[in-house]
């Protein structure tokens, strides 16, 4: 079986956020951003080796981080370049000629899950190129100046994340073709394959909202909250709803959707249910006073 090698892309400079410190060195949940994905890929049994592509001015810093982290799978620290594709090319050239898969991941996506890594590695046993995506939730427009030119069908649109994974020979050939194009311009590695090796289909693996990228300062608060949610251990659910028979339950948002379904299941289990919602009881769950009044 072809080995899966993870490439952590940590070549950013922090300029997009207007900062002098690269974002991969920001701290969240007690660690630098770059440490979290290294931890995740280190733990995954499907990953054989990890290489980190660093901003050339911070290679020594990255070496110190690796020494302190004690990760056994980190074998190389490579120098990136000015553009994102320069970092990808550094890894491709470092492993050129080897029969391996490369799994590229942004250092500033600290919440990549084991489920995503597992699914990507599983797909690599059948496919030569993989992207991780989520459905578009907002309406996307194509602008013509300061007017709407067209509105694509949202059901066909996906938001790209990482990891993006490839058989090395595929991504290497795609970049060889791309670099011969004087108008070469893409934003990620899957874009290179789609444009320059259209004969290779790119398989889609479902992503996760938590697998977000640090792009703006405000993102740090969202990412920190995702870490808090991930770290919260929920109590084990009862084997059946029989344990709730004769109990009393309060359900906020119980007039429709998931809340309505929960109310129905509780009623069926013999639970005494009090359902509150703005549309039925005038309860505003965003107001402490309104919630307190409902519970009196």
Listing of model-derived features with the role each one plays in the protein:
Residues 2-59:
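N-terminal glycine-rich phosphate-binding loop and ensuing alpha1 helix
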Residues 11, 249-253, 276:
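Conserved N-terminal Rossmann-fold NAD(P)-binding element of oxidoreductases
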Residues 14, 255, 263:
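N-terminal Rossmann NAD(P)H-binding glycine-rich loop of SDR-like oxidoreductase domains
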Residues 30, 107, 254:
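NAD(P)H cofactor-binding loop motif with strongest signal on the N-terminal glycine-rich segment
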Residues 34-99, 181-182:
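Conserved N-terminal catalytic core of the sugar/cofactor nucleotidyltransferase
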Residues 50-51, 270-283:
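Conserved glycine-rich Rossmann-like NAD(P)H-binding loop of the short-chain dehydrogenase/reductase
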Residues 77, 278-290, 296:
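Rossmann-fold cofactor-recognition segment
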Residues 111-203:
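Conserved core of the sugar-phosphate nucleotidyltransferase
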């Amino acid at each position: 079986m072809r080995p899966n090698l993870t490439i952590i892309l940590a070549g950013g400079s922090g300029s997009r956020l207007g900062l002098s410190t690269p974002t991969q060195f920001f701290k969240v949940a007690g660690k630098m951003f770059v440490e979290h994905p290294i931890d995740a890929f280190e733990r995954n049994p499907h990953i054989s080796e990890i290489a980190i592509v660093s901003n050339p001015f911070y290679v020594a810093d990255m070496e110190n981080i690796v020494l302190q982290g004690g990760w056994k799978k980190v074998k190389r620290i490579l120098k990136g370049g000015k553009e994102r594709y320069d970092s990808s090319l550094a890894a491709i050239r470092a492993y050129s000629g080897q029969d391996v898969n490369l799994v590229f991941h942004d250092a500033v996506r600290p919440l990549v899950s084991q489920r995503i890594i597992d699914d990507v590695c599983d797909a690599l046993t059948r496919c030569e190129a993989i992207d991780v995506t989520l459905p578009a939730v907002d309406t996307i427009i194509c602008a013509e100046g300061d007017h709407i030119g067209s509105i694509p069908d949202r059901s066909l649109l996906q938001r790209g994340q990482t990891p993006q994974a490839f058989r090395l020979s595929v991504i290497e050939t795609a970049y060889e073709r791309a670099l011969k194009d004087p108008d070469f311009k893409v934003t990620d590695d899957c874009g290179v394959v789609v444009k320059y090796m259209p004969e290779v289909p790119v398989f889609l693996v479902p992503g996760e909202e938590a697998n977000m990228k640090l792009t703006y300062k405000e993102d740090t608060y969202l990412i920190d909250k995702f870490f808090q949610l991930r770290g919260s251990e929920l109590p084990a659910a009862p084997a059946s709803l029989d344990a709730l028979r004769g109990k009393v339950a309060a359900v906020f948002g119980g007039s429709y959707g998931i809340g309505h379904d929960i109310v129905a299941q509780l009623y069926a289990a013999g639970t005494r249910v009090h359902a509150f919602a703005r549309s039925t009881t005038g309860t505003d769950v965003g107001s402490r006073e309104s919630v307190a009044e409902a519970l009196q």
